[in-house]
Swiss-Prot record:
Chief location: membrane
Other facts noted in the record for this chain: Carbon 2 of the heme B porphyrin ring is defined according to the Fischer nomenclature.
Membrane topology of this protein: Multi-pass membrane protein
Organism: Christiangramia forsetii (strain DSM 17595 / CGMCC 1.15422 / KT0803) (Gramella forsetii)
Gene Ontology terms: cellular component: plasma membrane
Subcellular location per the Swiss-Prot or TrEMBL entry: Cell membrane
GO molecular function (one): protoheme IX farnesyltransferase activity
Catalytic activity: heme b + (2E,6E)-farnesyl diphosphate + H2O = Fe(II)-heme o + diphosphate
Lineage: Bacteria, Pseudomonadati, Bacteroidota, Flavobacteriia, Flavobacteriales
Protein name from the UniProt record: Protoheme IX farnesyltransferase
Regions crossing the membrane: 20-40, 43-63, 94-114, 116-136, 142-162, 173-193, 215-235, 241-261, 276-296
Enzyme Commission code(s) on record: 2.5.1.141
Length: 300
């Protein structure tokens, strides 16, 4: 029996489409937006939820496609990214640009159907990510600070979609995800430091895998935990958190802090990788706890 594998062009095209839009990342961003919507909605409108998910996915996919167009030559230098559709030559720039442009237009239209402010914040996010954050990545470690702004929008975007306005509640959600960006992306920058160096990317605050970077990771992890607990004290409007849920969030934060301290002690790529996964677990579980806390308070 022959072991020859038949090449499936359709499967290859679909795979490249998923990669140029970073489907898995887009889905995680949609999760944040939907969580924010559940927190801000007085009654759940599943049509709005669907529009938010579709619009959010399209905007994130567009940002990722534009990013890969801009960085295609640098991606070719790094082991992690050299097999992406553009540097590998499986997709042309015009095709990628067409995908990005179509996603942008469709995404903005879908978000505008929800309400104008949701579309406005979606547009701000894609502009900051593509036009400012992406070019800065090869110029200064401050790119992480700039990138934290569009990166923090999805969680608050859901609340804006539910309420049609920006106030202290979505502002708090924004701050939680804003501070979280720093330990998360610095952990990635430490873990993949050698590969990023090949592409000329500046990801760590000191530019090195050193004590200074590790200390800043610990500090921003602490800030993330503290900001996450503010709703417990009843000072963030309709966004509230019961003491029990606050304790759960605090314990989750201690778990993330544990891995940040381990990175400080070990200063290894493996420790950074573990912190990266811990940070993803933290923000995901935090959003779940926030949503469950709201629903339980309403049911009791």
């Amino acid at each position: 029996m022959s072991n020859t594998r038949v090449h499936n062009p359709s499967a290859s095209i679909l795979s490249d489409f998923k990669e140029i839009t970073k489907m898995r990342l887009a889905i995680s961003v949609v999760f944040s937006s939907v969580a924010g919507y559940f927190l801000g909605a007085d009654t759940i409108d599943f049509v709005t939820v669907t529009l938010l998910a579709i619009g959010g996915y399209l905007m994130v996919g567009a940002s990722n496609a534009y990013n890969q167009i801009i960085e295609r030559n640098l991606d070719a230098l790094m082991d992690r990214t050299k097999n992406r559709p553009l540097p590998a030559g499986r997709m042309s720039v015009p095709v990628a640009f067409t995908i990005a442009s179509a996603f942008t237009v469709l995404g903005l239209v879908v978000l505008y159907v929800i309400n104008p402010k949701t579309a406005m914040f979606g547009a701000i996010s894609i502009f900051l990510y593509v036009s400012i954050y992406t070019p800065l990545k090869t110029k200064t470690p401050l790119s992480v600070f700039v990138g934290a702004f569009p990166g923090a929008i999805p969680f608050m975007l859901g609340w804006v979609a539910a309420s049609g306005s920006f106030s202290i509640e979505p502002g708090t959600l924004f701050m939680i995800q804003f501070f979280w960006q720093f330990p998360h992306f610095w952990a990635i920058g430490w873990w993949l430091f050698d590969d990023y160096k090949k592409g000329g990317f500046f990801m760590l605050p000191t530019g090195k895998r050193d004590r200074g970077t590790a200390i800043q990771i610990i500090l921003y992890t602490c800030w993330t935990i503290l900001v996450s607990l503010i709703p417990v004290f009843g000072v963030t409007g309709k966004l509230m958190l019961t003491p029990v849920s606050g304790i759960i969030i605090f314990l989750l934060g201690l778990g993330m802090l544990y891995y940040a301290i381990r990175l400080f002690k070990e200063k290894t790529a493996e420790a950074a990788k573990k912190l990266m996964f811990a940070s993803v677990s933290y923000i995901t579980l935090l959003q779940i706890v926030y949503v469950l806390d709201k629903f339980i308070r309403e049911w009791i």
